[in-house]
C-alpha cells in the first residue's frame, strides 16, 4: 500500500508548533522552509485577528509522522534569517497538564508491574530515541518495586513524541507516561519566565496568552477549588470535584487530604490507584516528593507563575483560521480569574500566596515578552 493509499495517522501526531518566528514570516515562507521535509497538509502563522500582526508562532502539519520525524531530525531550523523552535504540538486536552509545554528529557512511567525489568522498558522506549538512564524505583526499606520508573533520553523530542501518544504497553501491561518534572525544573521554569520581560505570554499581546486576549476557558480556573496541590485539597487537577482523570475525587494532585497521592484516595494512595500502599505518584516521597507534604501547589515563585495573565491558546482555535487546536469551556490554563492553577499555595512559595500555575497575580508568563 502506498503512502497516498494508507489511512492517515491522527492529525495531532503530524502537527508541529513552530515558535520564535520572525514577525516578517508569512504562511508562504514558513511553508517553503518546512516542505523540504515532506508534504504539508496545513501551514499557518498565527495572527492577531484585529491587527493581523504575527504573534510570533505558527503550526505546520505534515502528511505523515515520518515526515515530522524528518523535520525534527533536521534541527536547528532557520526561517527568514531567524532560528525557530519546532516542537510537537500539544493537544488541547494535554495542554492543561502541568508542565505540558516544558522542555524535558525525562519521563515518568507509572503502573508498571512487579515483573517488569529494565530491559522491558529499554526494549519499548528505545524506539523513540537514545536512552541515557532507566531507573525503576524501589522502596528503600523493603527493596520492593514501587510500580513506577523514570526514563531519561538524550533529546527532549523523544519525550514530546512519547507523551502525545495516549497508550503505551510495556511487558504486556498498559502504563501511564508523562513528563517527569523535578522541583528544580519547576523552579527554573518559574525563574526563566521572570527573566523574560513583562506581562505578555507566549506570543501574546497585552496580557494575552499564547494566542490572544481571552483565557483558555473563561469561567474559572482549571483546577477548581483546591487546585493542583492546593492546600485545602478541595478540588482536583481536573475540576472542582474530580481528581486527575477521576483518580481521587476529593483532593488535588498531592493535596492536603485525599487526592492524587493524598491520604485516602487517588493515584498511589492507600486505597486505590497506581502504586497502592501509599506509595504512588508523589506519595511517601516518590516522584521527587511532588506534594511536598500537601499545602504547596505546583506553581512558581511568589508573584510570578507559569502561565500568567492569559492562556495557552485562548483566543480561539488554533485556527480561528480553521483547525481545532483551541480552548475548552470551563477552566482556564493560566487565567486571570481569582483562583490560580496552583490553588491556595505554591510549590516554591509561601503557602496561600495566591499565585499558582498561571494564577491571577502573575507579572510574567509562559514564554512572556514578545516571543521566544
Curated annotation (Swiss-Prot):
Protein name from the UniProt record: Heterogeneous nuclear ribonucleoprotein A1
Cross-link (Glycyl lysine isopeptide (Lys-Gly) (interchain with G-Cter in SUMO2)): 3, 8, 78, 179, 183, 350
Keywords for the protein's UniProt record, in alphabetical order: Acetylation, Amyotrophic lateral sclerosis, Cytoplasm, Disease variant, Host-virus interaction, Isopeptide bond, Methylation, mRNA processing, mRNA splicing, mRNA transport, Neurodegeneration, Nucleus, Phosphoprotein, Repeat, Ribonucleoprotein, RNA-binding, Spliceosome, Transport, Ubl conjugation
UniProt region (Globular B domain), positions on chain: 95-185
Region (Nuclear targeting sequence (M9)): 320-357
Function: Involved in the packaging of pre-mRNA into hnRNP particles, transport of poly(A) mRNA from the nucleus to the cytoplasm and modulation of splice site selection. Plays a role in the splicing of pyruvate kinase PKM by binding repressively to sequences flanking PKM exon 9, inhibiting exon 9 inclusion and resulting in exon 10 inclusion and production of the PKM M2 isoform. Binds to the IRES and thereby inhibits the translation of the apoptosis protease activating factor APAF1. May bind to specific miRNA hairpins. (Microbial infection) May play a role in HCV RNA replication.
Gene source species: Homo sapiens
SUPFAM superfamilies: RNA-binding domain, RBD
Biased composition (Low complexity): 360-372
Linked pathology: Inclusion body myopathy with early-onset Paget disease with or without frontotemporal dementia 3: An autosomal dominant disease characterized by disabling muscle weakness clinically resembling to limb girdle muscular dystrophy, osteolytic bone lesions consistent with Paget disease, and premature frontotemporal dementia. Clinical features show incomplete penetrance. Amyotrophic lateral sclerosis 20: A neurodegenerative disorder affecting upper motor neurons in the brain and lower motor neurons in the brain stem and spinal cord, resulting in fatal paralysis. Sensory abnormalities are absent. The pathologic hallmarks of the disease include pallor of the corticospinal tract due to loss of motor neurons, presence of ubiquitin-positive inclusions within surviving motor neurons, and deposition of pathologic aggregates. The etiology of amyotrophic lateral sclerosis is likely to be multifactorial, involving both genetic and environmental factors.
In-chain residues carrying the UniProt-annotated modification N-acetylserine: 2
GO BP field: alternative mRNA splicing, via spliceosome; cellular response to glucose starvation; cellular response to sodium arsenite; import into nucleus; mRNA splicing, via spliceosome; mRNA transport; negative regulation of telomere maintenance via telomerase; nuclear export
GO cellular component, one term: cytosol
Domain RRM: 14-97, 105-184
Assembly with partners or alone: Identified in the spliceosome C complex. Identified in a IGF2BP1-dependent mRNP granule complex containing untranslated mRNAs. Interacts with SEPT6. Interacts with C9orf72. Interacts with KHDRBS1. Interacts with UBQLN2. Interacts with PPIA/CYPA. Interacts (via the RGG-box) with the HOXB-AS3 peptide; the interaction inhibits binding of HNRNPA1 to the intronic sequences flanking exon 9 of the PKM gene, preventing inclusion of exon 9 and promoting inclusion of exon 10 which suppresses formation of the PKM M2 isoform and promotes production of the M1 isoform. (Microbial infection) Interacts with HCV NS5B and with the 5'-UTR and 3'-UTR of HCV RNA.
Signal peptide: none
Post-translational modification Phosphoserine, affected residues: 2, 4, 6, 22, 192, 199, 337, 361-365, 368
Residues found modified as Dimethylated arginine: 194, 206, 225
N6-acetyllysine modification, residue list: 3, 350
Region described as RNA-binding RGG-box: 218-240
Residue(s) carrying N-acetylmethionine: 1
Amino acid at each position: 500500500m502506498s503512502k497516498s493509499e494508507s489511512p492517515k495517522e491522527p492529525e495531532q501526531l503530524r502537527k508541529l508548533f513552530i515558535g520564535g518566528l520572525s514577525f516578517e514570516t508569512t504562511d508562504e515562507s514558513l511553508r517553503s522552509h518546512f516542505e523540504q521535509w515532506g508534504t504539508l497538509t496545513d501551514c499557518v502563522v498565527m495572527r492577531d485577528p484585529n491587527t493581523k500582526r504575527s504573534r510570533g508562532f505558527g503550526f505546520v502539519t505534515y502528511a505523515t509522522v515520518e515526515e515530522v520525524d524528518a523535520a525534527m531530525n533536521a534541527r536547528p531550523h532557520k526561517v527568514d534569517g531567524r532560528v525557530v523552535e519546532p516542537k510537537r504540538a500539544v493537544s488541547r486536552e494535554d495542554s492543561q497538564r502541568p508542565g505540558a509545554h516544558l522542555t524535558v528529557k525525562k519521563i515518568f512511567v507509572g503502573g508498571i508491574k512487579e515483573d517488569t525489568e529494565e530491559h522491558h522498558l529499554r526494549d519499548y522506549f528505545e524506539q523513540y530515541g537514545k536512552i541515557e538512564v532507566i531507573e525503576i524505583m524501589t522502596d528503600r526499606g523493603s527493596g520492593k518495586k514501587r510500580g513506577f520508573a523514570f526514563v531519561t533520553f538524550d533529546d527532549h523530542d523523544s519525550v514530546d513524541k512519547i507523551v502525545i501518544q495516549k497508550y503505551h504497553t510495556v511487558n504486556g501491561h498498559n502504563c501511564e507516561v508523562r513528563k517527569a518534572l523535578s522541583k528544580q525544573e519547576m523552579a527554573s521554569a518559574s525563574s526563566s519566565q521572570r527573566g523574560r520581560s513583562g506581562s505578555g505570554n507566549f506570543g501574546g499581546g497585552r496580557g494575552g496568552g499564547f494566542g490572544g486576549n481571552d483565557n483558555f476557558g473563561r469561567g474559572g480556573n482549571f483546577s477548581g477549588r483546591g487546585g493542583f496541590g492546593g492546600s485545602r485539597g478541595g478540588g482536583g487537577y481536573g475540576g472542582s470535584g474530580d481528581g486527575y482523570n477521576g483518580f481521587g475525587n476529593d483532593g488535588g494532585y498531592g493535596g492536603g487530604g485525599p487526592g492524587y497521592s493524598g491520604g485516602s484516595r487517588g493515584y498511589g494512595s492507600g486505597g486505590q490507584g497506581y502504586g497502592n500502599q501509599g506509595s504512588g505518584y508523589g506519595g511517601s516521597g516518590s516522584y521527587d516528593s511532588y506534594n511536598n507534604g500537601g499545602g504547596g501547589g505546583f506553581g512558581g515563585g511568589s508573584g510570578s507563575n507559569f502561565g500568567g495573565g492569559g492562556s495557552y491558546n485562548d483566543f480561539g482555535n488554533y485556527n480561528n483560521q480553521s483547525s481545532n487546536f483551541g480552548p475548552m469551556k470551563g477552566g482556564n490554563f493560566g487565567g486571570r480569574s481569582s483562583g490560580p492553577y496552583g490553588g491556595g499555595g505554591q510549590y516554591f512559595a509561601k503557602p496561600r500566596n495566591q499565585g499558582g500555575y498561571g494564577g491571577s497575580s502573575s507579572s510574567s508568563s509562559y514564554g512572556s515578552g514578545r516571543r521566544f
